[in-house]
Structure formats: structure tokens, C-alpha cells
UniProtKB/Swiss-Prot annotation:
Family: Belongs to the RNR ribonuclease family. RNase R subfamily.
Domain called S1 motif: residue spans: 611-689
Molecular functions per Gene Ontology: exoribonuclease II activity; RNA binding
NCBIfam families on file: 3_prime_RNase, RNase_R
Function recorded in the entry: 3'-5' exoribonuclease that releases 5'-nucleoside monophosphates and is involved in maturation of structured RNAs.
Subcellular localization: Cytoplasm
Lineage, uppermost ranks: Bacteria, Bacillati, Mycoplasmatota, Mycoplasmoidales, Metamycoplasmataceae
EC number: 3.1.13.1
GO cellular component: cytosol
Stored InterPro entries: NA-bd_OB-fold (IPR012340), RNase_II/R (IPR001900), RNase_II/R_CS (IPR022966), RNase_II/RNase_R (IPR004476), RNase_R (IPR011805), RNR_Ribonuclease (IPR050180), S1_domain (IPR003029)
Family annotation (Gene3D superfamilies): Nucleic acid-binding proteins (2.40.50.140)
Designated name of the protein: Ribonuclease R
Gene: rnr
Catalytic activity from the UniProt record: Exonucleolytic cleavage in the 3'- to 5'-direction to yield nucleoside 5'-phosphates
Pfam families documented for this protein: RNB, S1
């Protein structure tokens, strides 16, 4: 009957049940069979039902194969090899789960022009995806519960002989799926729900972040001396009598940069001394291979996952005070206008005289504390030089956005007890200015010498992003002329005019940042738009960034030692592209991990704010709602379904969400109430303060409906409800 019905329906035309029966000449006695046929066709996605209850045959566009990516329990996407993505409704999963390879048919939506959807027809490959969940034990039976919402409608079956306890968080792999039942095999224990860090453990497991170093790396690092040995003093500039200092955060343990500043009659000498990691980490050693695999350190609220073993990162490579340390140094001679007169790169040895913190130096600049007179003089000279460098960069087109960020404060047990907005002081800006000049100087020298190198590059913003930035500013009543933006200086001049005529808040600064392209590593130099630098590399943090370590190696082997230069050039030319790609990739991964974990700990703190009113600013508008930012720089979501009482639509450019009566625009300040927190996902849900009471009524009705449905389902399972045919 299904084939008969389908043959006699015209595409994109709506038919009532009676019309279909009449067209197909179906006797009323067979209405139940027709109903079954129609519902089967609905399940297959071959027909759809409109709001009037009528049936519409849909156009088949093509057959596809791809990877099934489930977003939540209600929908998914199929991603194909040509990077196309097709929407799949829950009714059309047909047994597929996340990461399965599937075959599907793509249909044209009869409701929205140019909209398509897919229906899974066949599972091509069970890729045995991994799932993380927790164990509950009832009447001696172990039950596995997945954290991911997309799996909450499934029933799991796990081996009862596995060695796990109540609340253990475990990793399993899917063995098979039969009728919404997933059979899984135990892989390992990840954490426990009793830990304040279990959500963090889950993020690290999902990202396959390895904390511990392999045995061969630890064995190799154990052979490295924990002090500078006698032969290492040879052929180095001895700077141990100089007033060289470090300035870092309160919690910093890996000190990879130190400074010395001297003011002379007609110039400044800025000496930047960087930990000589390349002296200890040889190319292609076990430590080096692991460092490249990690490519960066990851900084979490409660710990650091280092790029190098602790013996190096916090030990022999760290420029700790009062001990001799090997350094890669650059002396930069700078005139009083901020121009670099000359530079000198060399290998040195230092003995840091002071381990200062940003807070200490800021207190000194604010006349809150006194220091050693010689140190005070150098710090004052340093501040003078920093301001000169800052003005120089400003003239070149650098925009110092000073975007406010928040830091999670944990107690001894690891629970979030506060969120602090970080304010940058003079000392933080000073170190940044000095490091930028050092990075520019090294990049310029490598380029001038025509040597293979690794650059930190940042392309010009696209015309599309500049146009969107202009539109965004106009919604805020700010004029900005896109066609004139042809260089960092042009962008900077336009932004300065905005600052002179309007009050610039954190949101506008974030919009500037969003307008920019992402900075990456490359063996090809195109300059750095954001820093207004023609040449820029990362030289100053080899303990925590692999590109810096690689750059040190290039300098040692091609600038300091010119033997076999042709062979060295060929060698590095072959590997630098891969090193750049790996470093860029791992940086993105690290930023994502840091953001996820910070969001989790922030959400944990916001549990105590449920039901409270907060001031917020709209920072992003998407098809499903709008993100807002609170005064402590934490984000929350107002889902479009929680914009109550009116029918809201999002503008195509994402600058506005509006109904017939109300408009909300990017940058607008609003009052909201926190209504829900998901610590596992690091999400905070809010509603407009004016909608709060209506939201509570809606939520109560929904919970009552769920409870009633659960009771009915239970009774149905127990045979207490008899449905008439």
C-alpha cells in the first residue's frame, strides 16, 4: 500500500487523509492500513505533515554518505567528505548514533525554500564510538548513564563483572545497538562524581589530553643535571653581575623571560633574556618529540599541563632567582623616539637578582611600596621605555584593546568560590611591550638574513568581517567607515576617532577582536596585522610554546653556527611547515580545553545565583537565542524559546532579534534572571527579568507533564493501561 500511495501523490502538494483515500480508491474498511502506511512513510521521511494535519510528498534530491554527528537527543547532522552538512531530525536517525558512517537520502523541505533535510537509510559502519558516563547501582545491578544528552533516550547494557563502584565516571565503547538499546564495553575509569574536578577529567579524556609524560621522556630528563655544569659556561656572555630580574604572576612557576634595562645619554638598552631550552632539548630527542606533540602548555584553574617535564619547566630551564641559568639573549638599542638602532643576539648566562610579581611592581608604580634603590631606578627607566614603545606602536597602528577577562578562584577542595575580573596594570603592559619588541627584532633579523624561520602571522581582516563590524557599530549609533581600512594604521585611526566620540565598552573591544582573523604560525611571513608588525615571531616563551623552542634552534644552528649552512637551510625548510601546522592546531585545542574548563568552573559558581537578577549585555545573537555577558565577564544564554509572550525572529546579519513589539540588539544592556546551570557542559541559562514569572509557570507545567507521562509509561509497561484499537 505504501508504494501505491506514494505513486499517486504529487510532490509539494498537501493532501488530507480523505483525499489520499479517495485518490487511491481505498475502501473505508482499510483506513487503519492506510494510517499505518502513512505513518511508515512519515518515519521514512518520504512524506511530511503540515500544521493543518495534511500530508505532503517531498522531493528526493540525492543520496549521500557521511559521518553522523549527533548534537542532542532531538537532531543531528550528517557531514560529508566535501564538507557539506545535512540536518537530520530524531525521527530519521534510524538507529544511527554519533560518529557512525551512514548512507542517507537528502530531501527538499516543502515548508522553507532552499532548506534540505536528510533521512538515514543505512548504517555503513559502526565506528564503535566512545561514551563517558557514570555508574549507579540498584539492587546489585550496575547501570551506566551517559552524560551526553544525545544518549539519554537510550538504555545501556554493561558487563556486570567490571570492577567499578557507585558514582564512578567511566569510559565505554559501543559494541552494538539493538532497538534503542546500546551494548557497551568498559574501557577505563576516568574519575568519580565525588570529585570536584570530575567534569575537568571528562574534558581532558574527551580531548585525549595526556597529563603524564611517557617513560622514555622521563628517563631522558632524569639524565639532565639540575644545575649548570662547568662546560656550559664556555663561549657564553657572562651577565651574572647584572641587575637582571623576572616579573611574572603570583602563581607562576616556569620563568622563561627576564629583563635588564639601562638608560644612557641618547638611548635605552633593553636586554631580554630567555631560557635556553634548546640547549637541553635536542632535536628529535624523546623530550623534543613529546614537546612537539603537545606544542604548548595548557593552563587550567587548578593546574598546568606542561609542554616539558617539570624538571625542565620548573627546574633547570626556569630563570629562578639566585641561581645560574643559561639564556638566549637579545640586546636591543632603542632611541628616545622608540626606533630600534641596532640589535645583538647571543648566548648568555645570568643569575636573576629578583623574582618580582606584577602586583609588587604595580604597587611600586602606585607608590605603595619601596624597593632597593638600584632596582627602583631600573624599574622607573623601564616604565619610561615602556611608554615610549607603547606610543611608537600606537603610531604604527597597534590597538591596545585591554579586553577585560575573568579568573576563577578555587578553594582548597577545588570548588569555585569567586570570579575575579582581571585588571592589567603598568607592569603587565611593560612586559608585553618588551616582549613584543624582542619578538619583532628576532623576526626582522631572521628575515634580513634570508634564513628559514617560523613566524607568528596575522592576516588583514576580510572585507566581509569589516562590513559586519560597521553594521554592528551602526546598531549602537557609532559611525565607522569600512572602505578606508587598508592597513593597521587606517584601522587604528578609525578606532581612535570612535574612542574620541563614543564611550567604548568591553563589547565593542570584543567586536574588534571578532573582526580580526586568527593568528597562526607559518614558515611564510605576511606580517601581523593586529600588532601592526611587518615581522613577528614567538621567541620569548620556549618553556611553554614549541615555536619559540624551534626558533631558538634555528638561531643556534644558522646564526651562531654557519657551518653546513646549505644543508641546515634545506633541513629546516622541509620541517617548518609541519611544525607550524602542528603548533597552530595544538594552540587551538589548548584554548578550547582552557575555555571549556573555565566555563565549567564558572557555571559551578553560578549555581548559587539561580533565581537572582543580574545586569547583562547582549554579546551575540544566533538562530537559537542570544548570549549575554554579566559584569564578571561570565556568559549566559537566553534561548529563543524562553523569549516569552511574543514571536521573535533573528535578522539575517545576526545583529537583531525582534518581534512586532520588541527589539533586542547587539551591545544592548538588559536585566536577566539565572534559571538553570549545567556544570557538566559549563552552561548558564537565563531569562529576561520581565519574563521570569511566566517562565516559572511554563517550567512547572512542563515538569508536571513529564511526571504524568513518566507515570503513564510505567503503567503501560506494567499492563495497567488498555488502549482501544
Amino acid at each position: 500500500m505504501k508504494n501505491l500511495v506514494l505513486q499517486n501523490l504529487k510532490s509539494n502538494k498537501a493532501y488530507s487523509f480523505l483525499e489520499i483515500a479517495r485518490i487511491n480508491k481505498i475502501n473505508p474498511n482499510f483506513n487503519s492500513q492506510l494510517s499505518k502506511a502513512l505513518f511508515s512513510l512519515l518515519d521514512q521521511g518520504l512524506i511530511v505533515k503540515n500544521n493543518d494535519g495534511n500530508f505532503i510528498k517531498v522531493n528526493e534530491i540525492k543520496k549521500i554518505q557521511g559521518i553522523f554527528k549527533q548534537s542532542n537527543r532531538n537532531f543531528a547532522f550528517i557531514e560529508t567528505a566535501d564538507e557539506q552538512s545535512y540536518f537530520v531530525a530524531k525521527a530519521h536517525f534510524n538507529g544511527a548514533i554519533n560518529s557512525f558512517e551512514v548512507e542517507a537520502i537528502v530531501y527538499e523541505s516543502p515548508f522553507e525554500k532552499d532548506k534540505k533535510y536528510a533521512v538515514v537509510k543505512k548504517i555503513l559502519k559502526n565506528t564503535h564510538p566512545e561514551i563517558i558516563g557514570f555508574i549507579k547501582i540498584s539492587n546489585g545491578i550496575k547501570y551506566f548513564n551517559a552524560f551526553e544528552e544525545s544518549f539519554r533516550s537510550y538504555k545501556f547494557f554493561v558487563d556486570q563483572n567490571i570492577d567499578v563502584e557507585e558514582d564512578d565516571v567511566i569510559l565505554v565503547v559501543v559494541e552494538k545497538i539493538v532497538d534503542q538499546k546500546i551494548y557497551v564495553n568498559f574501557v577505563k575509569k576516568v574519575s568519580t562524581l565525588k570529585s570536584n574536578f570530575y567534569q575537568i577529567d571528562i574534558v581532558l579524556e574527551k580531548s585525549k589530553t595526556i597529563i603524564d609524560f611517557p617513560e622514555d621522556v622521563l628517563d631522558e630528563s632524569a639524565l639532565i643535571e639540575d644545575h649548570v655544569i662547568e662546560k656550559d659556561y664556555q663561549n657564553r656572555k657572562d651577565l651574572r653581575d647584572k641587575l637582571i630580574i623576572t616579573i611574572d604572576g603570583e602563581d607562576t612557576k616556569d620563568f622563561d623571560d627576564a629583563i635588564y634595562v639601562e638608560k644612557n645619554k641618547d638611548h635605552f638598552l633593553l636586554s631580554v633574556h630567555i631560557a635556553d631550552v634548546a640547549h637541553y632539548v635536542k632535536e628529535n630527542s624523546a623530550i623534543d618529540k613529546e614537546a612537539l606533540r603537545r606544542a604548548t602548555s595548557i593552563y587550567l584553574p587548578h593546574m598546568v599541563i606542561p609542554m616539558l617535564p617539570e624538571k625542565l619547566s620548573n627546574g633547570i630551564c626556569s630563570l629562578n632567582p639566585g641561581v645560574d641559568r643559561l639564556v638566549m639573549s637579545i640586546d636591543i638599542f632603542i632611541d628616545f623616539q622608540g626606533n630600534t638602532i641596532k640589535t645583538e643576539l647571543y648566548e648568555g648566562i645570568i643569575n636573576s637578582k629578583h623574582r618580582l610579581t606584577y602586583n609588587q611592581v604595580n604597587d611600586f608604580y602606585n607608590n605603595k611600596i619601596k624597593l632597593d634603590p638600584n632596582l627602583e631606578k631600573m624599574l622607573n627607566d623601564s616604565l619610561e621605555l615602556s611608554k615610549i614603545l607603547e606610543n611608537y606602536k600606537k603610531d604604527e597602528g597597534y590597538i591596545n584593546l585591554e579586553i577585560e577577562e575573568s579568573k576563577v578562584i578555587l578553594d582548597k577542595e577545588g570548588k569555585t568560590v569567586g570570579i575575579k575580573v582581571i585588571q592589567r596594570g603598568l607592569s603587565e603592559v611593560l612586559i608585553e611591550n618588551f616582549m613584543v619588541r624582542a619578538n619583532e627584532a628576532v623576526a626582522w633579523k631572521m628575515n634580513k638574513l634570508k634564513l628559514p624561520s617560523i613566524y607568528r602571522v596575522h592576516d588583514n581582516p576580510s572585507i566581509e568581517s569589516l562590513v559586519l563590524f560597521e553594521k554592528t557599530l551602526k546598531t549602537l549609533g557609532i559611525d565607522f567607515d569600512t572602505p578606508k581600512i587598508t592597513s593597521p594604521k587606517a584601522f587604528s585611526d578609525s578606532f581612535e576617532k570612535i574612542k574620541q566620540n563614543y564611550q567604548i565598552d568591553n563589547f565593542v573591544k570584543l567586536m574588534v577582536l571578532r573582526t580580526m582573523e586568527k593568528a597562526i604560525y607559518s614558515d611564510k611571513n605576511i606580517g601581523h596585522f593586529g600588532l601592526a608588525s611587518s615581522y613577528y615571531s614567538h621567541f620569548t616563551s620556549p618553556i611553554r610554546r614549541y615555536p619559540d623552542l624551534q626558533l631558538h634552534r634555528l638561531i643556534k644552528q644558522m646564526v651562531f653556527d654557519k657551518s653546513n649552512l646549505k644543508e641546515k637551510k634545506n633541513h629546516f625548510s622541509l620541517i617548518l611547515s609541519d611544525v607550524s601546522v602542528q603548533s597552530s592546531k595544538k594552540e587551538v585545542e589548548a584554548v578550547s580545553i582552557e575555555r571549556q574548563i573555565n566555563d565549567i568552573k564558572k557555571a559551578e559558581y553560578y549555581e548559587s545565583k539561580i533565581g537572582k537578577s543580574l545586569k547583562a549585555q547582549i554579546v551575540s545573537i544566533l538562530s537559537f537565542g542570544m548570549f549575554v555577558e554579566f559584569e564578571d565577564k561570565v556568559s549566559g544564554l537566553i534561548h529563543i524559546s524562553n523569549l516569552l509572550g511574543e514571536d521573535f525572529q533573528v535578522s539575517e546579519d545576526g545583529l537583531l532579534i525582534s518581534s512586532n513589539k520588541t527589539k533586542y540588539k547587539l551591545g544592548q544592556e538588559i536585566d536577566v534572571v539565572v534559571v538553570k546551570v549545567d556544570k557538566n557542559l559549563g552552561k548558564v541559562d537565563v531569562v529576561l527579568e520581565k519574563d521570569y514569572q511566566e517562565y516559572l509557570k511554563k517550567e512547572q507545567a512542563f515538569q508536571a507533564f513529564k511526571k504524568n507521562k513518566f507515570t503513564q509509561d510505567k503503567e503501560k509497561q506494567n499492563g495497567k493501561i488498555n488502549y482501544k484499537k
